[in-house]
C-alpha cells in the first residue's frame, strides 16, 4: 500500500518503477483518501519478501511518495478485499431461485435482475471470491468482472 501526493503523472511513475524492474502488476487500485491531496494505491505483485522490500525502498525514494507499507511484516495487520460482478444466465424462475439461494449462503448481493440474467455482487477475501466463482460456474456461460484488491492497515 502506497500513499502518494495527488499530482499528474505520479501513478505512471509508480507503475513504471515496477515495469522497469520486470514485475507484472497483478492488481492495481487507486483512490482518493479523505484528504483530496493524497491518493492511496494498493499494488499486488508476485515477488519474494526480499523483492518486495527492495521495491518498497525504491518507492520511498520517489518524491511524491508519502509512505509505503508492505504485506509480510509479522506485526502488521491489515484488511484486504476484492469484488466481483458476475452476470449469470437465467432463463427460468427455478434457476433464479437457485441463484438467490446461493447468494444467501455466500452473503452475496443481487445487483440486478434482467429478463435473461442475474447480476451478483461478491466482495471478500480471496477465499470468498474463489468459493463464489466455483458456486456460480454451474450455471454455464457466466461473465465475470473482477476488481483489484483494496487494502487498509489496522493502525
Where are these regions (language model features)?
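Long, contiguous binding/interaction regions
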Residues: 1-39, 44-155
Amino acid at each position: 500500500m502506497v500513499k502518494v501526493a495527488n499530482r499528474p503523472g505520479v501513478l505512471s511513475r509508480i507503475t513504471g518503477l515496477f515495469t522497469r524492474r520486470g514485475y507484472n502488476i497483478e492488481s492495481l487500485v487507486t483512490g482518493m483518501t479523505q484528504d483530496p491531496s493524497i491518493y492511496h494505491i494498493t499494488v499486488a505483485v508476485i515477488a519474494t519478501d526480499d523483492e518486495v522490500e527492495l521495491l518498497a525502498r525504491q518507492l520511498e525514494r520517489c518524491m511524491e511518495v508519502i509512505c509505503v507499507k508492505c504485506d509480510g511484516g509479522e506485526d502488521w495487520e491489515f484488511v484486504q478485499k476484492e469484488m466481483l460482478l458476475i452476470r449469470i444466465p437465467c432463463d427460468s424462475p427455478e434457476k433464479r431461485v437457485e441463484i438467490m439461494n446461493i447468494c444467501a449462503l455466500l452473503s452475496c448481493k443481487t445487483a440486478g435482475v434482467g429478463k435473461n440474467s442475474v447480476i451478483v455482487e461478491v466482495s471478500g477475501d480471496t477465499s470468498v471470491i474463489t468459493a463464489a466463482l466455483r458456486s456460480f460456474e454451474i450455471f454455464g456461460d457466466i461473465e465475470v468482472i473482477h476488481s483489484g484488491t483494496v487494502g487498509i492497515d489496522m493502525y
